[in-house]
Amino acid sequence: MSKRTLEGSHRKKVRKSGFLSRSQSPTGRRILKARRKKGRKMLVKY
């Protein structure tokens, strides 16, 4: 059997779109603010 085409790395996902990385950049903070305003249960996926 051949390998799957997409094998996501958990570490990469967390570093790119985790809570800490979101809260460190101005645009990321804007995303969190918008998700809080909308009433999202989960602010970030990881």
Swiss-Prot record:
GO MF, one example: structural constituent of ribosome
Family: Belongs to the bacterial ribosomal protein bL34 family.
Compartments in which it is found: Plastid, Cyanelle
Predominant subcellular localization, coarse grouping: plastid
Entry keyword annotation includes Iron-sulfur: no
Sequence ranges of Basic residues compositional bias: 30-46
Record protein name field: Large ribosomal subunit protein bL34c
Stored InterPro entries: Ribosomal_bL34 (IPR000271), Ribosomal_bL34_CS (IPR020939)
GO biological processes: translation
Keyword set, alphabetical order: Cyanelle, Plastid, Ribonucleoprotein, Ribosomal protein
GO cellular component: cyanelle; ribonucleoprotein complex; ribosome
Chain intervals for the UniProt region annotation (Disordered): 1-46
Pfam family for this entry, one: Ribosomal_L34
